[in-house]
């Protein structure tokens, strides 16, 4: 590719999926430019690495580009996309560019409705500890690396495979993981769940004859597609027929302790005693996927154990901000932030919080993400939001969608009041959320901020507020 394409421009370069690919291309020696309406940590990092980052979209930004990369979040009438097409500059979907990177190495693609980012991070961390020095492209910041992408010298590239727009069907990896299959992004599949499952079956057909599909058989929908997967399979989970199986899982001080039984290629491997530096049974499953891949690639057991014990987590995936003082100075509350925005993953995260912090009041500040998701999962949202002890609920983060009156934040608030499990506090503007949290907390509470939108900035504001308070008292 490099002898033809030297200058690559990204429309929406600050996005989680785009910035990682841009960073790897920078490290490969390409000249990278990009535009974004916002200025975030990803754009600042890319600029520091040598990318030309422009704020706002303008037709002039694509001047000199040999290719323009876009995500599905970028509309077809974007001025940069229109300019590229008029100048016959190739407009390349993000997944197609990721597929090009995968052609340079052996691809490990992590798919599934929930858990992709954490599982990708765990796989990358275990392979790195095993000396395989993988390249990785992750949808969140891997805390140990300080970035969501890295160019390694090894044979493997580990990346998330996105089913939301069916773009994962562009990838041709040698190892695939499917963590679970759930009803999300159903507009892509004509609101037909059978079509979504068929897409995952087609994803496994992208594997070569020597490839491996690593499947979580705890998930009933993954189990349903199992008979239709024609490539070699490694089953993982808590289920008795899992080849990579966790037993005796228990929560200890915010970590998960468990034993892994392994049956691969007709051989019984020695059991592994694992301490995972993450809470929750769902993260045990995510770790099992990493263990399955590492075992297949003959990573030493000691490296697997060490990587999972010392895993530093991923930004906005049960990210702990520590203790924050209550406004009255009578004590502190524990602050945790999470990207969860679908009822299934929210339930898993809240269960993990209960396990990590037993017998403590759980306060959730939640920003729904997309009106269509809120509409499609409305009753499930009401159910999961009703499990917390106190709830602050904001308006839906639109993500470019038009409002749906019966599926907005106020509609959710009314439904929760009718259900009677929790009395929600509706917070109209996200700027008001930090103060609303401070008004609601008591000493000893666990506060979880959750959502895929602008609520991600709230924990930093709470920490800054505390630091300013401490400075004024010094």
Curated annotation (Swiss-Prot):
An example Gene Ontology molecular-function term: ATP binding
GO cellular component labels: cytoplasm
Principal place of residence: cytoplasm
Pathway(s) it belongs to: Cell wall biogenesis; peptidoglycan biosynthesis
Keyword annotations: ATP-binding, Cell cycle, Cell division, Cell shape, Cell wall biogenesis/degradation, Cytoplasm, Ligase, Nucleotide-binding, Peptidoglycan synthesis
List of residues binding ATP: 112-118
SUPFAM superfamilies xrefs: MurCD N-terminal domain (SSF51984), MurD-like peptide ligases, catalytic domain (SSF53623), MurD-like peptide ligases, peptide-binding domain (SSF53244)
Biological processes, Gene Ontology terms: cell division; cell wall organization; peptidoglycan biosynthetic process; regulation of cell shape
Reactions accelerated catalytically: UDP-N-acetyl-alpha-D-muramate + L-alanine + ATP = UDP-N-acetyl-alpha-D-muramoyl-L-alanine + ADP + phosphate + H(+)
Subcellular locations according to the entry: Cytoplasm
UniProt cross-references to Pfam families, sorted A to Z: Mur_ligase, Mur_ligase_C, Mur_ligase_M
Enzyme Commission no: 6.3.2.8
Family statement drawn from the similarity comment of this UniProt entry: Belongs to the MurCDEF family.
Protein role: Cell wall formation.
Protein's name in the database: UDP-N-acetylmuramate--L-alanine ligase
